[in-house]
């Protein structure tokens, strides 16, 4: 409770954020960095823009490539459209993801994009320009593998 309060989050909000971190991370060692990124976005009042929340909002867990049409859904779980945390968890958070939120890595990252090697890791960025470079590489890798949906 004390660690949650230090983050200006309730225990429920920690669970919600931990569920997003779990949905985003394929590797446990990356969870504290992802948690730190989302906490940075929350503290700056920036939309979370978390793809796992969009997949949840669309109720389509077959989505491998989030497209613009997915981002337009009017659903409070769509963190591309609604600021702050969604109203509830998008999945059951793990102890590891809860721990990652409560013991997040402090850094200045605001953006992340999956690596184009499909390792399950992310490239992190501090600026839009850095992020756009990473995103273009990943989009090209998706295109090369003919991943359209």
Where are these regions (language model features)?
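Bacterial extracytoplasmic/cell-wall-associated proteins, especially those involved in peptidoglycan
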Residues: 1-149
């Amino acid at each position: 409770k004390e660690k949650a309060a230090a983050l200006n989050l309730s225990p429920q909000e920690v669970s919600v954020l931990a569920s997003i971190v779990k949905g985003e991370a394929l590797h446990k060692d990356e969870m504290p960095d992802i948690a730190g990124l989302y906490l940075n976005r929350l503290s700056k009042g920036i939309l979370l823009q978390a793809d796992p929340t969009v997949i949840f909002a669309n109720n389509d867990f077959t989505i491998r490539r989030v497209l613009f049409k997915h981002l337009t859904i009017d659903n409070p779980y769509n963190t591309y459209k609604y600021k702050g945390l969604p109203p509830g968890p998008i999945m059951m958070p793990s102890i590891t993801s809860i721990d990652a939120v409560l013991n997040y890595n402090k850094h200045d990252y605001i953006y992340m994009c999956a690596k184009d090697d499909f390792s399950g890791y992310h490239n992190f960025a501090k600026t839009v320009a850095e992020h756009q470079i990473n995103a273009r590489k990943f989009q090209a890798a998706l295109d090369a593998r003919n991943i359209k949906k």
